[in-house]
Regions:
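Secondary-structure transition motif
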Residues: 1-160
Length: 160
């Protein structure tokens, strides 16, 4: 079973924090917190929660890169040690393609990666298509976390 964790940038200092997600629950201004839960036999208590910028909240995929680092939503991964072979981690709907015709034959919802166009080949079919993010793909492509869309927006533009 996958560990359900979130991370976000603290509102007070921009530092990343990971833990459980807690909605402030008050009407009006939306306030989101991330922190630890203390689980007792009969109780669950929130402990050490910090307010985070809601725009930076990312969910843990349950997967790790080739070096054992957690892969989060919106992370940027480098494949095969090649700085021009970059992908972004995404959760959502994507097309399942027929391997012979490359036409979309189905749609699924789940963790996948989207190609970041950095060179001519990454803009060409079939290399530009989204693929499921699985342990097998991570291992075969030697994927490594090199940043996130929040900390390294220049990587999304395709320049390392």
């Amino acid at each position: 079973m996958r560990e359900i964790l979130f991370k976000g940038k603290k509102k007070d200092n921009g530092e990343w924090i990971e833990g459980y997600l807690l909605d402030g629950g008050m009407p009006g201004e939306k306030r989101i917190f991330i922190g630890k839960l203390v689980i007792g036999k009969w109780t669950v208590m929130a402990d050490e929660f910090d307010e985070v910028d809601p725009d930076t909240i990312c969910e843990y995929t349950g997967l790790t890169d080739k070096k054992g680092k957690k892969i989060w939503e919106n992370d940027i991964l480098m494949c095969h040690g090649n700085s021009e072979d970059l992908v972004k981690t995404v959760f959502g709907e994507f097309g399942v393609r027929n391997i012979e015709t490359w036409s979309i034959v189905d749609k699924v919802v789940g963790w996948h990666y989207e190609i970041i166009p950095t060179d001519t080949i990454s803009r060409c079919e079939p290399f530009c298509y989204s693929m499921p993010l699985t342990k097998d793909y991570i291992d075969r492509c030697e994927m490594e976390v090199v940043g996130s869309i929040f900390d390294n927006p220049e990587l999304v533009q395709g320049s390392l």
